[in-house]
Amino acid sequence: LFSLRYAVELIYSKNQLVIFPEGKITTNGKKLKLKQGLFRLAKLARKKGEPIKIVPVGIAYDNVKPKFRDGFAMCIEKPFDLDDFANSSVDEFNFYLKSCIQEAEVKALIQVGRKLDDQLE
């Protein structure tokens, strides 16, 4: 719970916090299910009074299993406001976030010259 409190304090003090909403990173190119942690953390931080912006990001490497010094691309989608999901469930939030992340990942895959089916479900 220390890490959760620390994350909320980072957000409250207007620092940026990077979270992989899947809970981990995959090295085999397979999609992971989004966890509930990002939504819950953002809601906790929002209770402290600060508006919360979520910035979906897609990352792609030259190879499905990255090698040392491989190239990569990171594409950043338009931020959205947590308040837009004030009355939404975790599943509704994650559905929207996943679609934003997938858009960013497609753009990143194109940037590194990989086929779209290398990464998509």
Model-found features: residue ranges?
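Alpha-helix C-cap/termination motif
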Residues: L10-S13, K48, K107
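A cross-family acyltransferase "interaction/gating" segment
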Residues: Q16, K24-F95, S99
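A cross-taxonomic marker for long C-terminal extensions/tails that follow the last structured domain
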Residues: N87-E121
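Membrane-interfacial amphipathic helices and adjacent loop/beta segments
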Residues: L1-N15
